[in-house]
Amino acid sequence: MSLYIGLMSGTSMDGIDAALLELPSNQLIHGITKQYSDDVRRNLDDLIIGNHLTLASICQLNTLIGREFAEAVRQLLIEIKVHPKEIQAIGSHGQTVCHDTSGNIPYTLQLGCGHTISSLTGITVVADFRTRDLVNGGQGAPFAPLYHQQIFSKVNESVAVVNIGGIANVTFIAKNQMTRGWDIGPGNCLMDAWIYKNKGALFDKNGVWASQGEVIHPLLEYLLQDPFFHLDSPKSIGKEYFSLSWLQKHLKPDYTPADIQATLLALTAHTIAETILNESGEIKQLYLCGGGAHNTHLKESLARLLPGITVKSIAELGISPDYLEAMMFAWLAAQTINQIPVNLASITGAKGIAILGAVYPIIKSY
């Protein structure tokens, strides 16, 4: 038995998920979510939403986020009463602040200094997972399909898994076939940004506000024309693309805020449903994970758009929808520490197999 910790803060920026994973069983021992401090959250909003990309702010945030990730580890270990020396390594995704693979020089940046996390926790850290994939010709994301493949390794039917974080991504798994996956488009990011702007809430719990509005169909059709939705897979996208500024270019003064929220939920539902339906009717089971798995109105919308397909939370399999991505980075850290390469060719388009991440080691004294 080996213990690894995974750390994840997604494009929703709603906090740091920390998961203690037992391998090789892939059993979640314990998980916590630590909210960002007000200062860090405000600085992230300024950086990503306001595009205040100063060199000083990036460097400072890199250290500050590293400290907060380390604090999440400390809280996790205190709650579960495990000593840092019992942990083989931490896998840290970091906080994505920019990601764009559309140009001649693709780039990605995740903040959360690996040296800081390692020094403050006394545990070896693996971080910066996306860069190697970009260098190898991949999209740098999503990685979730790799771990979904582990969970459904004994699948006897074709299934789809959709992770609805800030950005939604899909995994298609079928017996005796290569696992495939890519980013679909906005998951929660636009809905979260719109309700925060209008009501000061971090998210629309259960989609209640969206359910009170009416879908603006001309707006929905216009949003669906965005070029990203028509790109071939593999593809990836960042929250900075599907931002409030992207949305506001398409709004008219007579649109009500609740109707816009309803339309944004419909955008997420339609893009997910279209992705699933394009699989030629092979998919009969759709599992949801991420924060969007708790949005009952979104789940109901997907069920209406996908007749004949069972839509359920991955929680029904006994797997936490909230900590699945953190678990994945614990698993990825184990692959890196043990020099086990992964194959992302059918997911990100990367050429060949690779060992992902950079290692920030700690010398353990026993």
UniProtKB/Swiss-Prot annotation:
InterPro entries recorded: Anhydro_N_Ac-Mur_kinase (IPR005338), ATPase_NBD (IPR043129)
Group of enzyme by EC: transferase
Binding positions (ATP): 10-17
Catalytic activity: 1,6-anhydro-N-acetyl-beta-muramate + ATP + H2O = N-acetyl-D-muramate 6-phosphate + ADP + H(+)
GO molecular function terms attached to this record: ATP binding; kinase activity; phosphotransferase activity, alcohol group as acceptor
Keyword terms: ATP-binding, Carbohydrate metabolism, Kinase, Nucleotide-binding, Transferase
Nucleotide-binding is among the record's keywords: yes
Disulphide-bridged cysteine pairs: none
CDD domains, per database record: ASKHA_NBD_ANMK
GO BP, sorted A to Z: 1,6-anhydro-N-acetyl-beta-muramic acid catabolic process; amino sugar metabolic process; peptidoglycan turnover
Record-stated family: Belongs to the anhydro-N-acetylmuramic acid kinase family.
Function: Catalyzes the specific phosphorylation of 1,6-anhydro-N-acetylmuramic acid (anhMurNAc) with the simultaneous cleavage of the 1,6-anhydro ring, generating MurNAc-6-P. Is required for the utilization of anhMurNAc either imported from the medium or derived from its own cell wall murein, and thus plays a role in cell wall recycling.
HAMAP family in the record: AnhMurNAc_kinase (MF_01270)
Protein name, per record: Anhydro-N-acetylmuramic acid kinase
Upper taxonomic lineage: Bacteria, Pseudomonadati, Pseudomonadota, Gammaproteobacteria, Legionellales
Gene name of this polypeptide: anmK
